[in-house]
Structure formats: structure tokens, C-alpha cells
């Protein structure tokens, strides 16, 4: 009884497997479905994945470029004593300098003057509290772009 039951189960399994195997075989042997499906599936997958990869790489590149630019700008400022205009001159956007160049002398003065000012103000603030209110009121105009233009 058990042998015949096993045979009937195996025959049933074969019976259920053969139509399932015939279904995909019929689809695979059909040249039109085989030619149309993979080209539609693969480009869709690539199109869905490529923009995400491009945006991700673009974000990384922007972050890296901005970090490198800021590092290079600060290194150039510290080592060569350049102003920001000297660093920004080789830019590919000359239309931006139409508004920057008239301000170049004031910007250069603003960039050169605050560099000596912050260390003494920090020293005076930590050394004596009596000079703190005057330095607090005098230091913000030196950092603001309009402060020096009004003083000069």
C-alpha cells in the first residue's frame, strides 16, 4: 500500500511539474517574447538605478569639492596672505565679479584688518573684564561687511 501511495504521489508530482515546466518552455521558445522582455526589463532596471547612483556620486563630489575648496582657501589665506578675491579670480563665472570687484579694496581691508583684531580681543576678554564691554561693542562692526564701509 505504501509503495503504491509513493508511486501515486511521485506520479502526481510529475504530473504537476510537467505542465509547470511546459509553461515557461513555451514562453522561452517564443522568440518574440524572449526578444521583447529582457531588453525592456534590463534598461528599466538600469534607468531606475543610474539616476540614484548619479545623484549619490554628485552629492559626494560636491561635498568633497566644497571641503577641498575651503581647505585650499584657508591654506592659501594663511600661507600666502591672499584675500578671497585673489582666490576667486580664476573662477569660470566672470559675471559674479562685476559686483565683487568694486568692493575689492574694502573687502581686502576687511579681510586684512580683522585678522590682527580677534586675538587681542580674545586676550583682553580673558585677561580683564573691564575692557570686555568696549571690545564687545567694537568687534561686531569689524566683522560685518558694512561696518568698515561706515567707518572708512
Curated annotation (Swiss-Prot):
Record's compositionally biased regions (Polar residues): 1-31
InterPro entries: SEEK1
Region span, Disordered: 1-42
Domain of life from the UniProt record: Eukaryota
Tissues and organs where the protein is expressed, per its UniProt entry: Expressed in skin. Also found in heart, placenta, liver, skeletal muscle and pancreas.
Name under which the protein is recorded: Psoriasis susceptibility 1 candidate gene 1 protein
Organism: Homo sapiens
Lineage of producing organism: Eukaryota, Metazoa, Chordata, Craniata, Vertebrata
Gene (UniProt): PSORS1C1
